[in-house]
Swiss-Prot record:
The keyword Metal-binding does not apply. It is an enzyme of class 3 (hydrolase). The keyword Cell division does not apply. GO terms for molecular function: guanosine-5'-triphosphate,3'-diphosphate diphosphatase activity. InterPro entries: ATPase_NBD, GppA/Ppx_hydrolase, Guo-5TP_3DP_PyrP, Ppx_GppA_C, Ppx_GppA_N, PyroPPase_GppA_Ppx. This is Guanosine-5'-triphosphate,3'-diphosphate pyrophosphatase. Keywords: Hydrolase. Its EC number is 3.6.1.40. It holds the Pfam family Ppx-GppA.
Length: 499
């Protein structure tokens, strides 16, 4: 039974949506118990004199009554509620905040744009893998946050008064998706960004991550259309052209775009295009968390330490009581194999990292049953929250685990959108071999294996006499050669006198 005192809640009263996150701490990370989101569109109820309409207030209070039921058994000291752009602007915000606090039974804090940006960055730093030198972009309903940081520290942060709801009302209020409306929206956004761009550019970054509903919508569109997870300027321009072709907001149809996100998608897209243009962004991926996660980690005083993905995988190993020594053997072999054929097979550091990640948890399916263990492993990875991994990376790892032995499903390997299909297939081949060679579960039983690749033909070169001295693994390798031949992957076994 989960004690209420072990629960924490973070509530974000945004300009477009209200969100609630309920978690508990497990092994130094967060286990999500509930996520509730309601479209309130508070910013749409802001009049020209910055007064919030009574209808918008009623929508907000109605949503908070739903949230309040979840909070009844959580100590108020373990609840944090913040309000952002719209309630910063509203001249009559106090009229909304008093009843809101009474409904929730705890205070509502209207945070500054800079504090919002800081919390967003903390949420990203705690949940997103990759380089520690990052630019974070969060397009909210009423504001857009831009932050450059290293590790857990935000170095430059800005909150700009533009968001997908306010830009919708200002530049698409006629609901027409014309080129002229897009150009006006983009130009206005660029004028907001330009005064701060030089300070962000001066810091520099290695990766760019997006932490907004607009970026989430783009991810959903790209997955639905079979594209990879990287958001690029060319993809944004294609989507803009598609929106213009649809003509009217009510007629906007893009494969993968949900009805819920469609209303503010064009305005968010216009802002994102401006961000790309002013900051010279080449590629962006989706962040693992943002404002609410930043609030939560701050409340629980959990440090940002080490590699987030490594911490996630080690937590999985503990949770499912995996044999970490065996995981290390397979990981070491798989990584070594990949580096031997890296040039011939065009494998880079990203490939090495993802292969190591899959190898570290390849036996996770055994925690359910040895029968269909690869399928169990894939299911667990697909349906577990993995901080530090993007949805596409998570899908790739699950696919590699599902294809770690016996039958090979080429369709699955080709449909993941993290790596090119051919590269995913090659990683699969290498991990399967690593598992076979490590099957004795002893360090002193690992042979000196040399791999060579010529296009798709893979040569496995072993010391002279090794196959006859190890008949079981020799049989596994012969079977593996057969499995790979079924999908037209030539695997040839050779022995050499050189050890």
């Amino acid at each position: 039974m989960i004690r209420a005192t072990s629960l924490y809640a973070a509530i974000d009263l945004g300009s477009n949506s209200f969100h609630m996150l309920v978690v508990r701490e497990v092994a130094g990370t967060l286990q999500t118990l509930a996520r509730i989101k309601r479209k309130v569109r508070l910013a749409a109820g802001l009049y020209g004199d910055n007064r919030l309409s009574s209808d918008a207030m009623q929508r907000g209070w109605q949503c908070l009554r739903l949230f309040a039921e979840h909070l009844q058994d959580i100590p108020p000291t373990q609840v944090r509620v913040v309000a952002t752009a719209t309630l910063r602007l509203a001249t009559n915000a106090a009229e909304f905040l008093g009843p809101a606090s009474a409904i929730l039974g705890c205070p509502v804090q209207v945070i500054s744009g800079e504090e919002e940006a800081r919390l967003i960055y903390q949420g990203v730093a705690h949940t997103t893998g990759g380089s520690d030198e990052r630019l974070v972009v969060d397009i909210g309903g009423g504001s857009t946050e831009l932050v450059v940081g290293r590790g857990a520290q935000a170095l430059e942060l800005f909150s700009l008064e533009m968001g997908c709801v306010t830009w919708l009302e200002r530049y698409f209020n006629d609901r027409s998706l014309t080129r002229e409306n897009f150009e006006r929206a983009e130009q206005a956004a660029r004028e907001k960004i330009r005064p701060v761009a030089f300070r962000l550019l001066a810091q520099g970054w290695q990766v760019c991550v997006g932490a907004s509903g607009t970026v989430q919508a783009l991810q959903e569109i790209m997955v639905a259309q079979g594209m990879d997870e990287h958001i690029t300027l060319s993809k944004l321009l294609q989507l803009k052209q598609r929106a213009i072709h649809c003509g009217k907001l009510e007629e906007l149809e893009i494969e993968g775009l949900t009805l819920e996100r469609a209303l503010v998608f064009p305005s968010g897209l216009a802002i994102l295009l401006a961000v790309f243009a002013e900051l010279g962004i080449t590629t962006m991926t989706l962040a693992g968390g943002a404002l609410r996660e930043g609030m939560m980690y701050g409340m629980m005083a959990l440090p940002v330490g080490g590699d987030i993905r490594q911490r996630t995988l080690e937590n999985l190993q503990r949770r499912y009581q995996l044999d970490t020594e065996q995981a290390q053997r397979v990981t070491w072999l798989a990584d070594g194999f990949a580096r031997q054929v890296a040039e011939a097979w065009q494998l880079d550091e990203r490939c090495f990292t993802l292969l190591r990640c899959a190898s570290m948890i390849h036996e996770i399916g055994l925690s359910i049953d040895i029968k269909r263990a690869p399928q169990h492993a894939a299911y667990l990875v697909r349906h577990t929250d993995l901080p530090g991994f993007t949805p596409a990376q998570q899908k790739l790892i699950a696919t590699l685990l599902q294809n770690q032995s016996n039958h090979i499903n080429l369709t699955q390997l080709n449909e993941q959108n993290c790596l090119a299909p051919r590269i995913a297939q090659r990683l699969c081949r290498l991990m399967r071999l690593a598992i076979i060679f490590a099957s004795r579960r002893r360090d002193d039983a690992l042979p000196a294996v040399e791999l060579r690749a010529a296009e798709e033909t893979l040569y496995v070169i072993l010391p002279q006499g090794w196959l006859s001295q190890h008949p079981l693994r020799a049989e596994y390798l012969e079977q593996e050669s057969q499995w790979q031949s079924y999908v037209h992957w030539p695997l040839l076994l050779e022995e050499t006198s050189q050890v």
